[in-house]
Amino acid sequence: MTKNLLVELGLEEMPAYVVKPSIKQLRQKMGQFLETNRLSFEKIEMFSTPRRLAIRVVHLADQQSDYSEDFKGPAKKIALDADGHFTKAAQGFVRGKGLTTDAIEFREVKGEEYVYVTKNEAGKPAKEVLGGLIDVLQSLTFPVNMHWANHTFEYIRPVHTLVVLLDDEALDLNFLDIKSGRISRGHRFLGQETQIASAASYETDLRAEFVIADAKEREDMIIEQIREIEKTYNVSVEIDEALLSEVLNLVEYPTAFMGSFDEKYLELPEEVLVTSMKTHQRYFVVRDQTGKLLPNFISVRNGNEQFIENVVKGNEKVLLARLEDGEFFWREDQRLQIADLVEKLKLVTFHEKIGSLYEHMMRTKQIAAYLAEQADLTDQEKAEIERAASIYKFDLLTGMVGEFDELQGIMGEKYATLAGESQAVATAVREHYLPISSDGQLPDSKVGAILAVADKLDTLLSFFSVGLIPSGSNDPYALRRATQGIVRILDKFGWEIPLDRLVANLYQFDFDSLTYQNQADVLAFIRGRVEKMIDKSVPKDIREAVLDSSTHIVRLEVEAAAALAEKADEDHFKASIESLSRVFNLAEKSNHNEMVDTSIFENEYEQELFDAVEELHFTEDMTDNVDRLFVLSPIIDAFFDNTMVMVDDEAVKKNRLNLLDRLAQKANTIAAFNEIRTK
């Protein structure tokens, strides 16, 4: 027989961002618990609101499956003494399994007999096992915790109710002094405490108390209500996925409504309006059918339509205060001078161990100038980079960015344009923040891209220099994201700037404000971010071989990894890698970069390999380059089959090593082939 199990944890309001990962974690840990305890089930359904986390296990077995496992013990010669009695080793082994020596039998394994015991355990009724659910609830982890009353135990929020039902039977458990039962809570304002009749009636019982327990159902309700508003008013609403996810985890009974604001505020930059509505008030933005912003918004109430007009007015009033602030800052900021704001950056701390924002900006300016040379930009682009790098942080001291920090860079572009800066400079001021997430949008302009890379490089090197290096998952200064941005931008624009040489050259810069330190750590950190750029399907040994190549150019490393992974299933791959590995291993014994003397070749195979190496030239197509290299495999094999490299004649040996080194150096621009496994 099977039954349905319901577990609901009733809490005080959780932050919206915690709800979804927490219910997923509960489902996963519940599944592990049931599997570990040999309780089969069909599926686990999830329910969540800001005030509850619940799962329903469908068709849970009413009894554990029986358990039987064989255990191998010591060899027979160790298990028995000279008189044939069981030794302490044998007795200790069976005692550790909860058995006696009566359970011992001997089995032959590879010609020798060993002690074996079989442990059988009859399955227990599910009700006896489910007391362990408390351990599951206690094991949940959260990004923030609190403790309350006399409890030393911390949890995301205080727990008020615990429902545990096996079909319609309430189980007696205790969690943080809360006894389980069938009492749950309805909507905070519209509902009341209610009894859950059975696991199967959970959603229905809560719906009667104005709680929609299924997050997907709440999401569908919100979307349907917004679409209905669109039809009624002939408008278009942007349903942002992140905002929708947040809103549905702020409410238990959603009711969408439309509010409005004075049209005069449409004169503000659109980003100010959208940020005020979406980010600060969690409103959905409303546009007309052409995409033009309208003086309206859609919000979602946690409740029904009763007194909805009062809710609309309240939301309009709150938004009005935001828009009035935005209007004030927009007007006042335009009176400021960029030069004055830049000067004031000298008084703004970038980090207490690193210095001011102005000093950071000046270091970035030098790095940007160097990068512009390496990227072969035009004189005009270099001039634009110099200007942008001289001012690009100025908007941090504007009132608008002080109030709406999400608009940093965005407002900088607008204020720079109003101040008469060129479009390229203004755009770079905005784009230098990109990407704002590990896979976010990248700069589109070369000037913005160079400034973004320079800014992130100084940030990375500065924090590493003062010992603020990420460890484990701890990365408070988002240095992984910044470094990922560096390699992604270099890859996008195809700038063939070797990262090892780039970093080495930056460490030669002479700044008054800071001396870069910990170069090896920086290079290792960047290497890790480049590896993230390589497709996850590429085998680890190929990734490592490419990263250990001599190129250190992001685009080429990514393309080389893809090309080698593509070839890995081809018939000639193994032979080609083995040939090149032999070349690499012997080339390590050479003095490197020395000339090859063809006059002392002793056989035709040396000459054939030399000619092939001299004719080996790579193109922009990495797959083609790998093919050009692999086609040399028969020539390499013929050389090794007919030529002893490590001969007694020192000149001949050195010459042959130099020949192999010449090939290895060319091949190493693709990968360190002796690191690729062929078994």
From Swiss-Prot:
One cellular-component annotation, GO: cytosol
E.C. designation(s): 6.1.1.14
PROSITE patterns, per the entry: AA_TRNA_LIGASE_II_GLYAB
UniProt keyword Secreted, yes or no: no
Cellular localisation: Cytoplasm
Catalytic activity: tRNA(Gly) + glycine + ATP = glycyl-tRNA(Gly) + AMP + diphosphate
GO BP: arginyl-tRNA aminoacylation; glycyl-tRNA aminoacylation
Pfam families noted in UniProt: DALR_1, tRNA_synt_2f
Main location: cytoplasm
InterPro entries, per the entry: DALR_anticod-bd (IPR008909), Gly-tRNA-synth_bsu (IPR015944), Gly-tRNA-synth_heterodimer (IPR006194)
Xref: HAMAP family: Gly_tRNA_synth_beta
Homology family: Belongs to the class-II aminoacyl-tRNA synthetase family.
Subunit structure: Tetramer of two alpha and two beta subunits.
Protein name, UniProt field: Glycine--tRNA ligase beta subunit
Species annotation: Streptococcus mutans serotype c (strain ATCC 700610 / UA159)
Gene: glyS
